[in-house]
Amino acid sequence: LWRGAKNRDWLRSIPGRFGGLPFRVTAPGGIWLHAVSVGEVISAATLLRAMRERLPDTPLYVSVTTTTGHALALEKLTGLCDGVFYTPLDFCFAVRRILRAMRPSLVLIMETEIWPNLWRETKRSGAGLLVVNARISDRALPRYVKMRWFFAPILAIPDAIHAQSAQDVERYAQLGAPRERLHLGRNLKYDFHPERIQTSPEVAEWVRGHAPAHVVIAASTMPGVDATDGDEDDLTLAAFEAMGLEGLLWIHVPRRPERFDVAAAKLTARGIRFVRRSQLESLTLPGVLLLDTLGELSGLFPLAHAVFMGGTLVRRGGHNVLEPAFFGKPVIAGPYMENFAEIAREFTAAGALLRIAGAAELAPRLRALLADAGGSGELARGLAESKRGATEIACRAAIEILEANWPRQRRPLFQYLLLKPLSLLWAWGARRKQNVVPERLAVPVICVGGLAMGGSGKTPTVLHLAEYFRRIGRTPGILTRGYRRVSPAPYALIAAGDPAPVSETGDEAQIFVRAGIAHLGIGGDRVDVGRRLLAKWPVDVVLLDDGYQHRRLHRDFDLLLLDAQDPLSGGSVFPLGRLREPAEGLRRANAIVLTRVQRGREYRRLLAYIEKQKPGMPVYRSRVVPGEWMPSARPEGKAAAFCGLGNPASFWATLRLMGIETCYRWAFGDHHQYRPAELARLKHHALEAGATVLLTTEKDWMNLPPEAEKILQPLTIRWLRIGIEIEAEEALLAQIRQQMKIQYRTN
């Protein structure tokens, strides 16, 4: 509270530090990457970019500890990840709150972030745990060794630890980490890409306008640990005064935002001419540009002729010298580089980093560097580029662990104790239902269903099969329950191509009506409705929609759909989880289709689980294919999106696949019936975000009130038609034909 009183950003971060998320997670199975502050956020950008290329459909979330890191992450990572949030305090309740909301398949920790409760709760949730860019500094090692008894069991928790250097591997082993889980992963900071860094056009123009003869950057200056240490702002500004060079532009960059005003006061007290980056004005050289903004230091390195790296003249352990090195700039550092000891040793030995023993040497060494025309800078660039490769190693490790894990649903103890008996009762009832004697229809029946409540792609799969049967000359019929229909009639029969109101069909069945490719029977008693369907039309194959647990109707082929991102829906039967029956029910299937598969994923653990349950089970994969926008093409402009689906993340992923970045989005509950007041609020938020177009799904379009378009004006609303594609589809169709003895024929 005291810290929050002094720093409003910290005060606003408190809900997040106790497990609150600033966004809604709509799909499990993503990756949570934890970075501490500014330096780790910059390294995370390269890693996230590589992971997004390999796993374009997998949700990526980033947590940070500091307010400055949070601000930079929002600025730099928004297009690379699906959400930025504050790392929870290492209390079990706060960590569990995040894990229950997010349900990641992998938690990826960067550098030396050893949080016992976060690590333990991650593994208890079913997620994998990977530590990358791991290091233990010279200064921290003695303290850690004294507490080996504490660290050894914690370091046994991660699935793998990828250390920056061979020395770090040995240090982790010394602390008790299992040897078989330790790997040499290199340093992510070497994978910095200077070509991706842009200098602020405003600053670049300002510098060009002043035509400095020399540009020196004092980067990430720090106060001392105590009074005997000194203050790098004082020490470096004294060096600036001592240099006395005509045309010198000194760019002064305090490490922390709270030091901006302190540095300005010191400049004023010394009588040094300066301007602040936030208030660019004309400056007579020699003078100082005080960088009082975040995230712009990297973009200034190309302008420099020499760089002093802060945190090295006082006992702070130093900062990363790799960024200026990649730009080919000569770098000076003081004696304190414990945080980057190996980098400092390698660069110093190669002549790529100039070390000074104290502040008195800074001014003369800078003078010498400015006369050197970049010799040590080119050495630094060459050495830094030779050390690349950590990102590729980290990506491979992350994907391997991601493939080996999927999230479990862990409820609070009081919920578990309350719901477990009800879950057992539900499971008993589900098993009992399997004992009924099924009744046959006069034609083959294909069931398309799932184990869990909620969406798994059943509707588009049924339509896909109906189109296939019509294409080969069959007359398909569809049987469906008609969820959320409000008609008092016990059933409805609708001919292919005929219209029917949503009140008579329900929203999902209305999609079948509008497709117009199959006769449709709607009702709870699907045996009775099926017979009525056959009596009315010459249907010769029936598709049973969402009927895997409807055992009264005999089926000739059971096609089970499993959502690849949450195949067992938390692993528990309703109401403890979302399973309609115990997971072993998948053994009844003739074939399984993994729906919503993500590009770059192999799902090895899921395939192994299915093989264990029923050896030889045929498994296929499907993904959503976006169709056309209705009722006409999507107009240009910023888009907002909303939906009410069992798995809203599938819609967001489809939009991303189409290259549509939404400025605002909101997920409602499955089968949501929209009220005018909700649409008015939706319009307000979308317009506030700058949207001109509102995007939704076909199912949601049907659940809008008649006056929706009028309420949403001036926004233009469009809904998306979707289909699916099935890998090895012909093999699946051949299996269905063989099982049902349907011979292929055309009209």
Question: Which residue ranges define each predicted feature?
Answer:
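A transmembrane-helix-recognition feature enriched in membrane-embedded lipid enzymes
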Residues: 1-15, 146, 409-444
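Active-site and donor-binding regions of nucleotide-sugar-utilizing enzymes
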Residues: 2-197, 218, 222, 228, ...
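Walker A (P-loop) phosphate-binding motif
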Residues: 28-34, 431-497, 599
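Conserved catalytic-core segment of nucleotide-activated headgroup transferases in glycan assembly
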Residues: 39-55, 194-279
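Phosphate/Mg2+-binding loops and adjacent switch elements
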Residues: 100, 482-614
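Acidic donor-binding loop of glycosyltransferase active sites
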Residues: 102-106, 285-316
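Catalytic binding pocket for nucleotide-activated donors in carbohydrate/polymer assembly enzymes
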Residues: 158, 302-382
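C-terminal alpha-helical cap of glycosyltransferases
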Residues: 386-409, 730-745
